[in-house]
Amino acid sequence: MMAALQTHKEYEKGTKKTFAPPTQKLHSEKPQPSSWKEDAPGTSSPEAETKPSLLKASLKKEQKPTTEHGPNRGQERKLKAQDQPAKKKGKERTLTSAEFEEIFQIVLQKSLQECLETSSCVQHIRPTKLDEEPGIVPPATDKKDADPEKVITPDTPKIASSLEEEVNSEMGTSKLGQPVTEPSKKKFNRLSLSKQKKKAEDEKMEKIQDGRECSLKEKQKIVIQDQSQIRGPQKEEESGFGHCVIWVQCSSPKCEKWRQLRGNIDPSVLPDDWSCDQNPDPNYNRCDIPEESWAGCESDVAYASYVPGSIIWAKQYGYPWWPGMIEADPDLGEYFLFASHLDSLPSKYHVTFFGETVSRAWIPVRMLKNFQELSLELVKKCKNKNSNQKLEAAIAMAHRAEQTSIQERVNLFGFWSRYNGADISEEGEDLTLCESNNPESCLEKEEKDLEEEKEEEEEKKDPTLPRPKPAKMQTKKPKSRGPAGGPDGTPKKKTAKKSLVSESTVPPVPTLGGKEEQGNSDLDHPVPKKKFKAPENKTSATNLSEEKEIKIVSKCPTPSAQHGACPLGKEGLVPHMPPTQEAASFPPDDDCSSDLDLEQLMEDIGEPEERGEMQQRGSSEEFLAALFEE
């Protein structure tokens, strides 16, 4: 009894602490009926009076059980509160760590299976991980796990490949003893994923570039022509071919194995229905032979349809389809570019064009075609005749390049080899075109020709040189021969007069009119007189007889001053005398020296006028003396 009383007191204490708020709520609710009575003071009906009494009775009844049966209800509520965490703990304890790992691996395996199911070529050899793993049963809540699987399933093949690597690493290090897949199967799965990735990228590029989906035939062609070019860690050689390995996939649906092309083979020339039996390698020329092992990663693979040396047709804006060759850019060292770092399909190729002019450019993939695809008739439909001739030369060069191997093709018809060859060879076609179109080269040629002409003229004009000296002194031959012949200069005077008169075609003038003509000749005389007064010859001519001889020669009649001759003189009897050999040889010399005499006249303009007047007086006196002697 004492124990029961103690427990009863403890329950009362517990009820007081636990159920204090509900009692306060009940006390706070008591004014509500009074307020309800106050709101309706005018209601005197018996129903209105009985309702408050009923409320009071109900409140009293509620208070009694709380006091009388309070410990029992409090105990029940405590038990309920204790049962709830116990249930939660029981629920948490039901899922162990091993079970959690199993569920996690099952989810990953299901996502991997869904990725593998997308590729049809893997369905017949795909291993079922659930069958291989004994003791792992898929849970009954597959529908609940379906939503997370949809989220985990990758949208892009690249994420699927990374997820596959994580799953393989986890499966290799798992504690459940799961068997690790063989390397050949793993590589096959990787290739199937790469194939799926290529399909997705092909569709994406075609939609972006063409603005429409390609036809079914083109899609099949793209799937069949899976030429993967694996770029090695080493850099490309200067030739442009580089250290790359070319792989081609068999078109047979039962095989679809990747075969490595050895040797200088252009993959763009291969047919669409290429199979293993067309492989030149005898070790891998059948479909039943397993695929060659390859130790590489997916990031090193680029799905390129062309390699350095592939001959193609390229189209640029404003130009017709033009033959060219795929070659590495000499500046970048690459021959294709990607639109983004996530792509595995090149968006542009570097093309070196064939033809007389050496040129290169980056061309989009949609503007490239194989050399065998485009007909020559469509290409040659060009309105410009000049471009037609250049196009024919380019096509001929492409045919010559087609006859060589892919490695020799790059070395012989590459950009640098043709560009350097055009610079070195003087007879190169490219050099002749550049020189004909370049105005600077024409100016250089003209300048060289002018310099050569000036040098020749200077050689003729320069008195110090031995060669031009007789050419400049030819008009003074009679004067130089005077002192050598003898002291008397009269015979030489006559010969000089004869030689100059022989040049003139004007009939002899009467003697009476000679004075007037002499006056006119004296006015015009200083110009031809200066012509014969060269500085070098002045010093040499010291005799007075020679000076008289020169002055008399200047008086001889000539038709005009263009030949370096003097005005007409008054000598009517001279033409009746027979000319000598010296006189006959003199006119051509005078003709040759006419241009030189004009320049000499310009140099001697600065001589004083007084000297010219003194010479005019002396010449008039000598002329009279000569007339008296005759």
Swiss-Prot record:
Tissue specificity note: Testis (at protein level). Expressed in thymus, brain, lung, ovary, oviduct and uterus.
One GO biological process term: positive regulation of double-strand break repair
Residues found modified as Phosphoserine: 619
Listed Gene3D superfamilies: 2.30.30.140, 3.30.40.100
A Gene Ontology cellular-component term: nucleus
An annotated Gene Ontology molecular function: histone H3K36me3 reader activity
Keywords for this protein: Chromosome, Coiled coil, Differentiation, Metal-binding, Nucleus, Phosphoprotein, Spermatogenesis, Zinc, Zinc-finger
Protein name in the entry: Zinc finger CW-type PWWP domain protein 1
